[in-house]
Amino acid sequence: MSSTRIPVIALLAAAGRGTRLGGPIPKAFVTLRERTLLERSLQAMLTSESVDEIIILVSPDMETYARDLLRKRGLLNDPEGVRIRLVHGGGERADSVWAGLQAILLDDATPDAIVLIHDSARALTPPGMIARVVRKVHEGATAVIPVLPVSDTIKRVSLDAGVVVDTPNRAELRAVQTPQGFLLSELVAANKKFFADPNPGFIPTDDASLMEWYGADVVCVQGDPMAFKVTTPIDMMLAQRITDEAEPTIFEVPGD
């Protein structure tokens, strides 16, 4: 748990259907070596010793399943002094995050609280990376994202004709991961503005893009290849191989 007086609250997104993974259940509840992706993401948050509360965003039809699962694992009894609770997510990611923020606001959280938003499908995220994001917000950043350099050449393509428009300079491009960290007051203000606008002009694919739209500076920290998102069957094969070979070391806390 965080030793600072400023609370750190994590929103763990687990409401997505995960159709690209090809399974019959939401991907957060897909099992990887006897533990669901949700459990693994939750454990990484706990092991990071950086959070005071974790809010799991689930679809209403999965709430009972999720609650029973976490209760069996002893994860609803404030493990390590961290409060864990379930909140209904929405149809889109932005809706789920807004539901989580409203739950935080109902608890009268301090405006300078730190909010982490994390994809449960990034189940092998190292705890040290989580701590790194939190630390950067503590240092004064309003919005923080973990990133990695891209190795592929990226093309911008016209959506209608499928023709290459240009080739961005790869040195300026980064692949963005989660958890992303934010100052609560600024994240709430950005969401209020977005949901009040009948025509915001875009659909945010992550929370940092919403903060960019709002006008906030988004600061980057070093990401980690282990924080990849389990989205497709190939991703799951990779995650299985990694856990088969490196399970005992995945949740060790690096000294960074």
Curated annotation (Swiss-Prot):
It is an enzyme of class 2 (transferase). It holds the Pfam family IspD. InterPro entries: IspD, IspD/TarI, IspD/TarI_cytidylyltransf_bact, ISPD_synthase_CS, Nucleotide-diphossugar_trans. Transmembrane segments: none annotated. The record marks 170, 229 as: Positions MEP for the nucleophilic attack. One of its GO terms (biological process) is isopentenyl diphosphate biosynthetic process, methylerythritol 4-phosphate pathway. Its EC number is 2.7.7.60. SUPFAM superfamilies: Nucleotide-diphospho-sugar transferases (SSF53448). The record marks 20, 27 as: Transition state stabilizer. GO terms for molecular function: 2-C-methyl-D-erythritol 4-phosphate cytidylyltransferase activity. Keywords: Isoprene biosynthesis, Nucleotidyltransferase, Transferase. Pathway: Isoprenoid biosynthesis; isopentenyl diphosphate biosynthesis via DXP pathway; isopentenyl diphosphate from 1-deoxy-D-xylulose 5-phosphate: step 2/6. It catalyses: 2-C-methyl-D-erythritol 4-phosphate + CTP + H(+) = 4-CDP-2-C-methyl-D-erythritol + diphosphate. Catalyzes the formation of 4-diphosphocytidyl-2-C-methyl-D-erythritol from CTP and 2-C-methyl-D-erythritol 4-phosphate (MEP). Belongs to the IspD/TarI cytidylyltransferase family. IspD subfamily. This is 2-C-methyl-D-erythritol 4-phosphate cytidylyltransferase.
